[in-house]
Regions:
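Catalytic cores of the polymerase beta-like nucleotidyltransferase superfamily
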Residues: 1-417
Length: 417
């Protein structure tokens, strides 16, 4: 008679008192015909996975054997003789190799997963098979971020060995990007992803820009961090609760410091512009979605302007808000930018034009007020006399006069707030 167990990340999350994102089940002692007869719908080509009426996944217990160099080159054995223990032993980390009885809620642990969860450690289940899939290096980095765990020394060395042997370069861009994107989810300790890869020298193939960033020294009068990589990681901690798009922008905002010309060091003048090409190269390599690329470039290009908001005249503030809100159409875009600006400015205790958080938030509120006033403003906003004056102009002259008119309108409205 077949038996069904809850397995993997769902069991781990329950032990961590977290709500499981997905629930996966393994069926021991069954076969395809029996599962279909019980009303399950079969999906998947390499090995049988079944969906119940609620869309939850059930997989036949299976063993696997590496038969080639590709991540798809595995032979799967999924007959009724495969045991629960054999199925769990093929998994990557001990915290993911747990099962739970459906009826009794008893947790079955063959590999010390509960111990490692308590100790907040990522440990390879079987070192000899762990190295068969180099993606596990990035999965280790991702789970370190997702769970806020540390990688135990032997597993760390296995990851280092795979990186040094050049195994990571054979991975697909889509698989690497997926792990980074998962590591950047809200409430994750996202900085641990890059910190782990830097520690084990695993950045060369997919993230070389961050090696250069780690070698970029900071000026103490701007950042107390030893180098730009450390500053970026501290800034990432500031946006721990925010979206992956915001985190990616913070991650990339100082990449231009990594290739500062030697003759202008220790200053990093122009790093905001130099960083744009580096973001393009990174996103091309990872095949990152355009929404990540576009926002990261917007923040990189404009993040130095944040530090000067307090000294800007109204026309400059108007232009900045217009640029950061898609011509006063998208307030969420502006809010995301200001969140990134806060992370950069207060990523550590640094001298700045702002004496405290309140000064920064005061200026942010001003930016939002400018948006609220200008959102929806068009020719019909103005009185007939002003419209007639504007219509006497054309081409570039019209654009200049129209902008001046809107700034005067903004100045008057700000005086009413």
């Amino acid at each position: 008679m077949s038996e069904i167990y809850l397995v993997g990340g769902a069991v781990r999350d329950i032990l961590l008192e977290r709500e499981p994102h997905d629930k996966d089940y393994v069926v021991v002692g069954s076969n395809v015909e029996e599962m279909l007869a019980r009303g399950f719908k079969q999906v998947g080509k390499d090995f049988p996975v079944f969906l119940d009426e609620n869309g939850e996944e059930y997989a036949l217990a299976r063993k696997e054997r590496k038969i080639g160099d590709s991540h798809t080159d595995f032979e799967f054995i999924f007959d009724p003789s495969v045991t629960l223990q054999e199925d769990l032993l093929r998994r990557d980390f001990t915290c993911n190799a747990l099962a739970r009885e459906i009826e009794t809620d008893e947790v079955i642990d063959y590999v010390g997963g509960k111990r490692d969860i308590h100790a907040k450690l990522l440990r390879a289940v079987r070192p000899e098979t762990f190295v068969e899939d180099p993606l596990r290096v990035f999965r280790a980095a991702r789970f370190a971020a997702q769970l806020n765990f540390d990688v135990e020394p032997l597993t760390k060395r296995l990851c280092w060995k795979m990186a040094q042997e050049g195994m990571l370069k054979h991975l697909s861009a889509e698989r690497v990007w997926k792990e980074l994107e998962k590591a950047l989810q809200p409430n994750y300790a996202s900085e641990k992803f890059m910190e782990f890869l830097l520690e084990i020298h695993a950045l060369d193939d997919w993230f070389p820009e961050f090696i250069d960033l780690a070698n970029a020294k900071e000026q103490k009068k701007f950042h107390w961090s030893e180098n730009s990589f450390k500053h970026t990681m501290i800034a990432l901690r500031r946006v721990r609760d925010y979206s992956s798009k915001v985190k990616f922008a913070v991650l990339c905002h100082d990449l231009g410091k990594g290739n500062t010309p030697v003759d202008i060091l220790p200053k990093h003048i122009g790093h905001d512009i130099r960083g744009l090409a580096l973001i393009d190269a990174l996103c091309d390599r990872l095949k990152a979605p355009n929404e990540y690329r576009d926002f990261a470039k917007t923040f990189c290009k404009n993040h130095m302007r944040c530090h000067k908001m307090g000294q800007m005249k109204l026309a400059k503030q108007y232009d900045l808000v217009r640029c950061l809100s898609d011509n006063f159409k998208d307030k969420e875009l502006l809010d995301d930018f200001l969140t990134c600006a806060y992370a950069d400015t207060f990523g550590e205790e640094v001298p700045s034009e702002f004496n405290d958080d309140s000064r920064f938030f005061e200026l942010c509120n001003r930016m939002r007020k400018i948006f609220d006033i200008m959102h929806g403003v068009n020719l019909q906003t103005f009185d007939e006399r002003t419209q007639q004056m504007l219509m006497r102009h054309s081409g570039e002259d019209f654009g200049k006069v129209y902008t001046e008119t809107k700034i005067r309108y903004l100045k008057n409205k700000l005086g009413e707030w």
